[in-house]
């Protein structure tokens, strides 16, 4: 933690990767290097090329390889594709020792429809909209209903978990325009509940972690 990179002292030079695609042991679809193996593969590359931040596409557990982690089922679970939680912690720690901060993509807008995830969690639409007109995203996933206290608490707790437990230096929130505007369409108007959620999220995380980097994707 003491050796983590500090974006306030120098310009950010960010390298973004999908962990399972940077380099593979073989051409097999389900053959990946684990978190610890990537220490000697990825970190020297970042140092050599002068990167001081690594942005990793979602590391939460997800069922479909093709989604690259953007349709999550296990928001509090590092994907086992690349090893254990302790191995991920070791990877982040070595990044910090080399002056490289670690940012993680986080998806607070939608989640996978699989029954073993959040969909219909308690037999009701606890986290998602009951109305399919706004409840289903363009990717066929469930949109989070950001007006609900359960949703806000869950997502902020999840982001705090990754920062606190894995020492992530920042969170990049994905597809935010799909939350701010109904179904991502400015012509349909602003979703004020989603705007309030983002304010709640940012204020809460900054209160707990003043130096954390909070970024968002706006694809309007």
Where are these predicted regions, by residue range?
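Conserved alpha/beta catalytic core and glycan-binding cleft of carbohydrate-active enzymes
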Residues: 167-169, 181-220
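Substrate-binding/active-site clefts of carbohydrate-active enzymes
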Residues: 2-12, 18-168, 172-190
């Amino acid at each position: 933690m003491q050796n983590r990179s500090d974006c306030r002292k120098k310009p950010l030079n960010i390298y973004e990767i999908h962990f399972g695609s940077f380099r593979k042991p073989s051409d097999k679809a389900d053959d990946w290097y684990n978190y610890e193996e990537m220490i000697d593969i990825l970190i020297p590359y970042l140092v050599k090329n002068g990167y001081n931040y690594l942005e990793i596409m979602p590391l939460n557990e997800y069922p479909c390889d093709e989604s690259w982690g953007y349709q999550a089922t296990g928001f509090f679970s590092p994907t086992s594709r690349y090893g254990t939680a302790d191995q991920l912690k070791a990877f982040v720690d070595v990044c910090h020792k080399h002056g490289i901060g670690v940012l993680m993509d986080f998806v607070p807008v939608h989640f996978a429809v699989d029954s073993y995830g959040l969909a219909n969690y308690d037999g009701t639409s606890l986290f998602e909209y009951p109305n399919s007109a706004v409840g289903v995203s363009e990717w066929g996933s469930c949109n989070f209903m950001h007006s609900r206290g359960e949703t806000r608490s869950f997502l902020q707790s999840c982001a705090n978990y990754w920062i606190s437990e894995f020492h992530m230096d920042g969170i990049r929130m994905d597809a935010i325009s799909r939350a701010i505007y109904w179904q991502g369409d400015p012509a349909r108007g602003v979703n004020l509940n989603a705007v309030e959620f983002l304010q709640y999220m940012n204020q809460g995380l900054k209160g707990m972690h003043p130096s954390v980097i909070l970024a968002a994707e706006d694809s309007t």
